[in-house]
Amino acid sequence: PSVRRQRQMCIRDSVTLCWHWMAPTQTEGKRHFYTEKTDFNLKQALENPGSAEYQGLLHDIDLICAELQKLQEAGVPILWRPLHEASGGWFWWGASGPKAYQSLWSLMYDRMTNVHGLNNLIWVYNGQDPKWYVGDERCDIIGDDPYYTNGSRVAYYFDSANANRFKTCYKTSQNKMIAMTENDFLPNLNRMFQKNTKWLTFCTWCREFVCVMDESAGWGVTTPEYSGKYASADELRTVYQDERVVTLERLNGSGGYGYACAG
C-alpha cells in the first residue's frame, strides 16, 4: 500500500512491513529480489564501497527511509522485517552467505538509525538460522516463517505448534521475543501452550493461504471467498476469538486488523 494508505490504516495501531528489495544491479532487466533472477553479487558490492552496486544499496536504503520517515512523523510504530528468510538463499541478500548478510544488515541498521534518525522501527530478524544472527544490539524480535512442505496437513498435525522451529529461534538468542512472522496453517493454540511455545505473534500470509485467487485480475489478486485450503472461515474465527489471542481490536478498541498476539 502507499504511505498515505498505511497512515490511514495504522494511525492508531502498529504496522508490519517487509521489504522485497529489488537488487540494485546495473544490468538491464535483472532488478529482482529472487537470486535466480538477478546477477547482483552482495559480497562484491560490500567489498567495493566506490562501486555503483554499493552506491545502489545506499540509494535504495535512503529511498525507503524517506517513506518510513513519513510514518514516523504520523506516529506509526513499525514492525520492520527487512532481509527476510536469508538463510534459504532464494533472495539475493542471502545468496552470499551469513557474513555478507550480517554486513548488509549492519549497514542498513546504521544508516536508518544514525543517519536518518528513524526511531519508530521495531527490528525483526528473520534470517532463520542462528549462524546468521545479527546480534542482540541490532534487533528487537526474532521471527520465523514456518511453512509446511507442499502445504501438508499431515506435517501440520504432527507439529501444529511449530515447536521445533520455536526452539531454533530460542537457540538464536534467549534475550528476544519470538514471533511467527509468516505462516500458512494457523498455529494450534492448545498445542502451543502445552509445549510452552508461546509465539509472540502470528501472521497468516495472503493470497491462496486465506482466499480464492482471482486469476483473471492478475498476480496476487484474490476474491472475498475463503479458499479453505489452509484455514476455513470457522478456523479463522475460532483462533481470533480465542481469549488467549490478543487482536488489535481487543488491545485498543480500534477495530483494526493485523497481527494477532498469542499471549
Q: Where does each model-flagged region fall?
A:
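Aromatic-lined carbohydrate-binding surfaces of glycoside hydrolases
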Residues: 12, 16-50, 54, 74, ...
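Alpha-helical scaffolding within the catalytic cores
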Residues: 63-67, 125-133, 160-168, 184-192
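Aromatic-lined carbohydrate-recognition surfaces of secreted/lumenal glycan-active proteins
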Residues: 81-83, 87, 105-131, 175-186
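Active-site groove signature of glycoside hydrolases
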Residues: 60-96, 126-128, 137, 142-146
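Aromatic- and acid-rich polysaccharide-binding/catalytic face
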Residues: 129-156, 203-206
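An active-site-proximal structural segment forming one wall of the substrate-binding cleft
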Residues: 42-79, 104-116
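Single conserved hydrophobic/aromatic residue that forms the stacking wall/gate
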Residues: 1-11
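Substrate-binding cleft of secreted/luminal carbohydrate-active enzymes
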Residues: 176-263
